[in-house]
Structure formats: structure tokens, C-alpha cells
């Protein structure tokens, strides 16, 4: 799927629920000291990608849709990059959320 981020589409992310609060699931690349939130263009890709993410045992994870700009605002506020990711874990695009209008 070709994803036009300028149109503020719905994208799919993995969300963790803890104590009734939902939180986007971020990942960390320790060698490069990068923290990022993977997002997917399609629900099926996110469901497949969920199993490739590092997760904590005993936590509840699910795939949810969110507007791209809302995700970008939250990522910028918490110091994360955004990685448009394929179902197989391949990174399609790296985005600095501070550059999103």
C-alpha cells in the first residue's frame, strides 16, 4: 500500500495497556541509541509485525488504528522517531516526528 502521510491517514500501531492506560509500544536500537515507534499501513501488517516486536511478559498488547499526526505528536513529545514498517519487520521509511506538520 502506498501511504501518503500528508493526508493524515489512519495508520496501525501496537498499543500496550497498563493499569487502564494505553501506550504506544516503542522499540529501542541500543547500538545506535535510537528509540522509535513502528507503525504500519495496514491492520494485517501490524498484526503480523506485532510478533516481531520486543514485548514484556504478562502485558496485554493489541493493534489499534490512529491518525498519523496524532501518533507523530505523541512520538515527538516523548522523544521517539517513527518507523513505517512492513509486516516482515523491514523498515520502509524513517520519520522524525518533529518534521510532521
Predicted regions and their residues:
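Conserved NAD+-utilizing ADP-ribose enzyme module
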Residues: 1-101
Amino acid at each position: 500500500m502506498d501511504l501518503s502521510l500528508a493526508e493524515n491517514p489512519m495508520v496501525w500501531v501496537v498499543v500496550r495497556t497498563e493499569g487502564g492506560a494505553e501506550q504506544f509500544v516503542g522499540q529501542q536500537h541500543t547500538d545506535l541509541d535510537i528509540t522509535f515507534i513502528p507503525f504500519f499501513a495496514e491492520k494485517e501488517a501490524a498484526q503480523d509485525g506485532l510478533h516481531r516486536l520486543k514485548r514484556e511478559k504478562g502485558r496485554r498488547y493489541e493493534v489499534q488504528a490512529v491518525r498519523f499526526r496524532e501518533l507523530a505528536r505523541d512520538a515527538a513529545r516523548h522523544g521517539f522517531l517513527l518507523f513505517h514498517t512492513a509486516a516482515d519487520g523491514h523498515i520502509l521509511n524513517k520519520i522524525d516526528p518533529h518534521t510532521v506538520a
